[in-house]
């Protein structure tokens, strides 16, 4: 079933839901350049005001996956993505990027999907380049990197070329729309397991149900009660978990994992150079909040990847990976593997 653009706009203005097949058709028009920038903007804002439903988000994500340039990873065992929606306004160092090296060192296979900074001090791509990695890889090279060192970083612009039609609109609007929450739902390697941070507590229940519809296996959607799109060390974190088809929602606290409470301000950075320093300190096992928040989020990734059976066990495994030097070695290995593609050209 198709729906005219103006009919769809009228429906969202009237606070009525766009049906699944209609949303598929509308999103395909956006991704193929068949919808004007004015209509894209109006539709995105209309959805925002109405509040996007689980069905609408799932349909839009399905189309983004359909148009994405994929990374072929036939074996999905222990394959996990660590990412966030961004936009939390907290400006911490790149916690999920640091956690990626720890999780990989402890046995997870990490297919991380990310880009350059939009709202933070630095994006995962910016920081990985500053650490010495080569990020502009082909899908085949990403798959080889994943096979060789347990990490495959997918630079978002290389995999979502069709977003070029919506990107200028999104940038000019300057407010959150459905496009802000679609990126983390569209991993090009189709990682079945995921730790996703979200900028608003309402998104915890929404995103976990979207990923349930999209067929994910083991997912943790997290929102720190201080506003962080990570599992927080400053207090409670809301978690929506999808496991074996079932959803549970609960709250965790650093003390649950034997970790102290810290003020979030000690994790803030102003630029990518400061973020790189924090990552290096964490991987070098420097005691303190920078290391501890990486242990916590890497532990969650190990749990989502089904390497361990609880976040507590994940934190323990992450601690061992850092203390033994394996996490720091994983960073060096990843940089060497990605640079080998650059020199091979």
From Swiss-Prot:
* Assembly, per entry: Homodimer.
Cofactor(s) demanded: Mg(2+)
Q: Where does Mg(2+) 1 bind?
A: 96, 230
Q: Which reaction does it catalyse?
A: N-(5-phospho-beta-D-ribosyl)anthranilate + diphosphate = 5-phospho-alpha-D-ribose 1-diphosphate + anthranilate
What's its top-level EC category? transferase
So what family is this one in? Belongs to the anthranilate phosphoribosyltransferase family.
Pfam families in the record = Glycos_trans_3N, Glycos_transf_3
One Gene Ontology cellular component term attached to this UniProt record is: cytosol
| Pathway stated in the Swiss-Prot or TrEMBL entry | Amino-acid biosynthesis; L-tryptophan biosynthesis; L-tryptophan from chorismate: step 2/5
Provide the residue positions that the database annotates as binding 5-phospho-alpha-D-ribose 1-diphosphate. 84, 87-88, 92, 94-97, 112-120, 124
Tell whether Amino-acid biosynthesis is among the UniProt keywords.
Answer: yes
Can you tell me which residues the record assigns to a coiled coil?
Answer: none
Residues binding anthranilate 1: 84
Annotated HAMAP family: TrpD (MF_00211)
Could you identify this protein by its name? Anthranilate phosphoribosyltransferase
Binding positions for anthranilate 2 per the UniProt entry: 170
User: What SUPFAM superfamilies does UniProt report for this protein, alphabetically?
Assistant: Nucleoside phosphorylase/phosphoribosyltransferase catalytic domain, Nucleoside phosphorylase/phosphoribosyltransferase N-terminal domain
GO annotations under biological process?
Answer: L-tryptophan biosynthetic process
The EC number on file is 2.4.2.18
List keywords of the entry alphabetically: Amino-acid biosynthesis, Aromatic amino acid biosynthesis, Glycosyltransferase, Magnesium, Metal-binding, Transferase, Tryptophan biosynthesis
Q: Which InterPro entries match?
A: Anthranilate_Pribosyl_Tfrase, Glycosyl_Trfase_fam3, Glycosyl_Trfase_fam3_N_dom, Glycosyl_Trfase_fam3_N_dom_sf, Nuc_phospho_transferase
The record lists the organism as: Leptothrix cholodnii (strain ATCC 51168 / LMG 8142 / SP-6)
